[in-house]
Amino acid sequence: MMSDLRLNQLYAGSNHIHIHGHRGARGVMPENTLEGFRYTFGIGIQFIELDILMTADGVPVITHNPRLMPYSTRRNGQWLEIEGPLIAETSFDELSQYDVGGLKPASDYGKRYPDQAFQFGQTVPRLVDLCHLV
């Protein structure tokens, strides 16, 4: 009962809605990219949701999945055929060789967000890069 009371207090008097940018601007711009976050802030959204993982060399990076995913990752202009390396086992320099600026159109994820912008050359950003952007 006590926890219900505290939860209700959070809603008391609130007459506005806070809009959050999920992974930046997922579905509009490539998720978890600096361009996606820049877009989100540019349209006036002040709250963002993101995930942070550590690379093998200890760099905090912004990415949702523990691996690079074939539906959103290209290397040397080609989509990955299978899941890529684990973020935790990849150095930041190695991770930066992958392009995460689009969705593979034929994938389920690509079909789910067919209007998402394709931004060539987007890499998994470091947390510090987002902090500088903010």
Which residues make up each language-model segment?
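Phosphate-group recognition and catalysis centered on beta-loop-alpha active-site segments
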Residues: 1-134
